[in-house]
A protein has these predicted regions:
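Interfacial loop-to-helix junctions that mark the boundaries of transmembrane helices
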Residues: 1-7, 109-121, 175-180, 221, ...
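Membrane-interfacial helix-loop connectors
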Residues: 69-84, 88, 99-121, 159, ...
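Hydrophobic alpha-helical transmembrane segments of multi-pass integral membrane proteins
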Residues: 42-69, 185-208
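Structural signal for the N-terminal portions of transmembrane helices
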Residues: 116-120, 149, 249-262, 281-306
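Membrane-embedded alpha-helical segments of transport systems
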Residues: 59-66, 85-101, 119-126, 155, ...
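Hydrophobic core segments of alpha-helical transmembrane domains in multi-pass membrane transport
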Residues: 9-22, 53-57, 126-137, 150-162, ...
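Helix-loop-helix hairpins and the membrane-proximal interhelical loops
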Residues: 1-46, 145-194, 212-215
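Membrane-water interface regions at transmembrane-helix termini and the short interhelical loops
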Residues: 75, 129-144, 244-248
Length: 306
């Protein structure tokens, strides 16, 4: 791996994070007002709250943003602490949608229909439409829609750039040893939590893991604990937003953290026992884009059931 590959990797990462930020901000502006009304009205029971949290987070692609809104609603008295719990649970599952979208980048079939599903096939068109709307749109809604499309195209281009740049890492012994270390579940959880805390987005963190999977050195045994840690790291944003709020709003942020920490402890313990006793072969297999998306969803669903 040359210095140019490193620079390409850094550039791809920057484009990916920038695109996700632009898309997320534009989605919140485009639908934020309506979604806030939905959040405040459709949370009278746990199931309604759960479905609302899932739906809102699927739209704005950020469980952190949804949870921050929930903390604000609890602080203002619009939502009770009890109502917030269902929304937080739904938000945790809604955030997995991003990984499923990114997993389309791993399609390698020669089938024309499957090829059309690859983001590299349609993102140039989205970028063109987004540019036209952003430059020539008269209303703020059209401009925001343009920003959403451009943001999505940018993050997918960044993802593709990262995937191409990291391919050379597969032959570097130090990189191979690094992911062998991450097979230690505790270390994997810590790495996932720290990375997500730094970039403030579990979706982006999972996307980076998906890009690294192209090397073939990321096993499911290493990926699963990292995914668990990513769910803990994403709680930091809500905790920070709760500073200066009332007691119940702080409790809502703590509920979010507790929900993910307890879920991680329970499932990590089970995962470690299964790994040590049964040694399933799948844990040694190389993770894929789709496999990581599936693992991310299954873990969040399992935490919600718990």
């Amino acid at each position: 791996m040359s210095i140019f590959d490193v620079l390409t990797l850094i550039g791809g990462l920057c484009l990916f994070l920038f695109g996700m930020n632009v898309m997320g901000d534009a989605l919140e502006r485009r639908a934020g007002g309506s979604l806030k009304k939905i959040l405040s009205k459709l949370t009278k029971n746990k199931m309604a709250g759960f479905l609302t949290g899932l739906g809102v987070t699927s739209v704005i692609q950020s469980s952190s943003a949804t949870t921050v809104m929930v903390v604000g609603f609890v602080n203002s008295g619009v939502m009770t602490l009890r109502q917030s719990i269902g929304v937080i649970m739904g938000a945790n599952i809604g955030t997995t949608v991003t990984a499923w979208i990114l997993s389309l980048g791993g399609i390698s079939s020669d089938n024309i229909v499957m090829q059309l599903l690859k983001p590299t096939s349609f993102t140039p068109v989205l970028a063109l439409i987004g540019t036209v709307l952003l430059m020539f749109g008269k209303s703020s809604k059209k401009k925001d829609t343009g920003s959403v499309l451009l943001g999505f195209a940018t993050l997918m281009f960044g993802m593709d750039t990262m995937s191409g740049a990291v391919a050379g890492l597969a032959d570097i012994p130090a990189f191979q040893n690094l992911f062998l270390m991450f097979k230690n579940p505790i270390l994997g959880v810590l790495v996932g939590a720290i990375l997500t805390t730094i970039i403030q987005s579990s979706s982006a963190s999972v996307g980076i893991l998906q890009a690294l999977s192209v090397t073939g050195q990321v096993s499911y045994g290493a990926a699963v604990p990292i995914i668990m840690g990513q769910n803990i790291g994403t709680c930091v944003t809500a905790l920070l937003s709760s500073f200066g709020t009332n007691k119940n709003a702080k409790r809502a942020a703590v509920v979010h953290l507790s929900f993910n920490v307890i879920g991680t402890i329970v499932w990590l313990t089970l995962f470690s026992i299964i790994s040590a006793v049964f040694k399933p072969m799948i844990l040694d297999e190389s993770a894929t884009y789709l496999g990581i998306a599936v693992a991310h969803s299954l873990f969040n669903i399992a935490c919600t059931i718990l």
